[in-house]
Swiss-Prot record:
Domain of life: Eukaryota
Protein's UniProt keywords contain Ribonucleoprotein: yes
The protein, known as: Large ribosomal subunit protein uL3c
NCBIfam families hit by this protein: L3_bact
Disordered: annotated span: 129-148
Length: 207
């Protein structure tokens, strides 16, 4: 049983299926991930496992991070993430999880930080329609009305306006696994995933 794994986005390409149709796919380098901590209901109030991914020099970690890993006799790891589980008997500290936990055709949810687009306007950020471009109009890409008048006399919270676009945690659900390469720890996913090549991703089975 796999709860979740961490990996990096390598890039996108395309492959052909048995019928000769082109499938756009994303190549992911996933795992191996090491279980660094197992939490249980009696001690921690809930069941979960913490996994680590990505070798790193010890000097790149803080002393609390090093102490946490050394307590379990685990080498320094760059990323740590916790996943909830139903029961803690299946997993042990030091156990290695890799892409063999998944199967071709399985649906997964992939979470990562989207590409940052900087400060963006309403047309780009919220898909607003622009104003007239001719006939004397000066309202081309302006937001237009942003509220009522004297009542309520303020801009209501949550109003769609210009601001930061992207650079936030995004989840793409129910992506299909096309191929698995266990020797190279490669997952081939149908479609696109968040972020640029090299972006850290969390891969969990779809509910």
């Amino acid at each position: 049983m796999v709860v979740g794994l961490l990996g990096n986005k390598i890039g996108m390409t395309q492959i052909f299926d048995e019928s000769g149709n082109i499938i756009p796919v994303t190549i992911l380098k996933v795992g191996p991930c090491v279980i660094t901590q197992v939490k249980n209901q009696s001690k921690d109030g809930y069941d979960s496992i913490q996994i680590g991914y990505g070798n790193v020099l010890s000097k790149a970690l803080t002393q609390p991070e090093l102490g946490h890993l050394q307590k379990s006799n685990i080498q320094p790891l760059k990323y740590l993430k916790e996943f909830r589980i139903n029961q803690e008997t299946e997993f042990q500290i030091g156990q290695v999880l890799n892409v063999d936990s998944f199967t071709p055709g399985q649906l997964v949810n992939i979470q990562g930080k989207s590409i940052g687009k900087g400060f963006s306007g309403l047309q780009k950020r919220h898909n607003f329609t622009r104003g007239p471009m001719t006939h004397g109009s000066k309202n081309h890409r302006a937001p237009g009305s942003i509220g009522m008048g004297t009542t309520p006399g303020r801009v209501l919270p949550g109003k769609k306006m210009s601001g930061q676009l992207g650079n936030k945690i995004t989840t793409i659900k129910k992506l299909k696994i096309i191929q698995i390469n266990s020797e190279e720890n490669i997952l081939v996913i149908k479609g696109s995933v968040p972020g640029k090549p090299g972006n850290l991703l969390s891969i969990v089975p779809s509910a």
